[in-house]
Amino acid sequence: MNKTKGFTKYKKMRYMPGLDGLRAIAVLGIIIYHLNKQWLTGGFLGVDTFFVISGYLITSLLLKEYDDTGIIKLKSFWIRRLKRLLPAVIVLLMVVGTATLLLKSDNIIRVKHDIIAAIFYVSNWWYIAKDVNYFEQFSFMPLKHLWSLAIEEQFYIFFPVILVTLLLTIKKRYKIGFIFWGVSIISLGLMMFIYSINGDHSRVYFGTDTRLQTLLLGVILAFLWPPFKLKNDPPKVVKYVIDSIGSLSFIVLILLFFIINDETNWIYDGGFYLISILTLFIIASVVHPSTWIAKIFSNPVLVFIGKRSYSLYLWHFAVISFVHSYYVDGQIPVYVYFIDISLTIIFAELSYRFIETPFRKEGIKALNWRPSYIPQFIRMAIVVTLLIPFMLILVGAFNKYGKDIIGEKANSFDTTIEDNYLMRIAPIDNIHIDGLVSEKKKESSDVYNNIKPLLIGDSVMVDIGESFKSSVPKSRIDGKVGRQLYQTLPLVKANYSQYKKSSDQVVLELGTNGDFTVKQLDDLLNQFGKAKIYLVNTRVPRIYEANVNRLLADAAKRKSNVTLIDWNKRSQGHSEYFAPDGVHLEYKGVLALKDEILKALKKK
């Protein structure tokens, strides 16, 4: 072994299959969450697991190089990262761009902008600027998941420079560790502060500044627990402690995958930090060369999946976005999920075998025009074929096919885009939906000319407002996009306190945008005194749907002046009622919900 100035040549760090096993758990959680978030409500925590692993592994590699050689070759590091990450992303972007042009051309402008952001690894800031909500998935945004890769790449660019600077200026490594810990606390504080001001999940979820805390915890672990310095034969007591802490942390993390959801507010008030600490304990145990938990995570099946975790992450969301765009959210047939999984596996395996691995080993030599090099030639031909439409998309050649909707609130329930689309109520003669008479005949009837109901609701009420007013001219309708039940009490006190008599009729359609408590519901109902109240329950593909409908049904049973309008039951199996989000209404849905309300009012 050649020695120069007290240092040896750099030796590769030992392979740690347990980390691949942990990657497998993380990516499976993410995929299940994106398939149907009600199956694994906290599956998105898998992203944080990846962040901690990245911080730990990258720092360990850099420290190992510095200890062996006395320097860190930044250029070589960045080239290795690009060879590892960029080719697979570029191929994904080319495929998604071409597929969007062929299958979803009206979205080509939005996807084009997302592609540009992804190329420069700024997707997270792009989505923040466009006020995109990560947790609402019914809008067609097949590249939205690349926000996390953007954060990691930004970290890979700046962190090595900072680390080298600190290593050269500060001799005591524990001091460097304290600096990174301090910055992680600042990042945590930023998340808590920004969230406390505006309650915006997406700003703190997407932000590099607010998510840096998780990556830096991995960095700190690399200083405390460098894998290249762990002993193969520690005392049995030490192994027992490591295994016990790692196992307990893993059990708690899996429980959190099932318990936490995107409405869990405490995760933004230190929760991500604490969950990442659990991940630290798991990593510490699976990278140790002699623990039994490391052997469990080194299971060949988990390692196989873990090695492909990057490809699986890249392709799963794009596949799900395309496939699910042809169905109503919340009413997706079971067989569709098998299609999702099958296509994800196929694309991920192709990417891993023919893109990731060759480019990681050979770099640009993985492409070759000479037919004698068959794999390289085929790869080159495919890339060039995809590159032509891809470049045309980027320069805007196909913009004429798209709608200029980039994403402002485009995938949030608090949106006017969907509602403006849904309110295109065209006169249709002789339409019949499950026994409904035509709109024209109903409007010509004077049955409802003399009733004066008050209707209060959210964006679904906005959807039916115009049609309902045409049938009940004296109705008073107050619908607002994004409204929640707890926000309605002050509104009622200020504007509708006169609706208290037994002859008054009040329709409340609330619960689309969030849950509420029994007390909040009762306080609202009590404001209407003896008035006849009609509660419209919800159909919304969110985890709170069942609880909202249960509370509304219970209120109807408890209070003699309250009637339940069971929109959930009425709309079951009627995908034609809904826009792609599974919540807002198409014209047939407008007529159906209006009919349910009118029938209830007529009975009383």
Swiss-Prot record:
Location(s) in or outside the cell: Cell membrane
Keyword Transferase on entry: yes
TM stretches of this protein: 15-35, 43-63, 85-105, 150-170, 176-196, 212-232, 240-260, 267-287, 310-330, 332-352, 377-397
Membrane topology: Multi-pass membrane protein
GO biological process terms held by the UniProt record: lipopolysaccharide biosynthetic process
Active-site residues, as the UniProt record annotates them: 459, 581, 584
Gene Ontology molecular functions: acyltransferase activity, transferring groups other than amino-acyl groups
Recorded coiled-coil stretches: none
Any one Gene Ontology cellular component term annotated for this protein: plasma membrane
Enzyme class per UniProt: transferase
Superkingdom classification of source: Bacteria
The enzyme's E.C. designation: 2.3.1.-
Keywords: Acyltransferase, Cell membrane, Membrane, Transferase, Transmembrane, Transmembrane helix
InterPro entries in alphabetical order: Acyl_transf_3_dom (IPR002656), Acyltransferase_3 (IPR050879), SGNH_hydro_sf (IPR036514)
Keyword flag Transmembrane helix: yes
Family from the record: Belongs to the acyltransferase 3 family.
Protein name stated in the entry: Putative O-acetyltransferase SAS0844
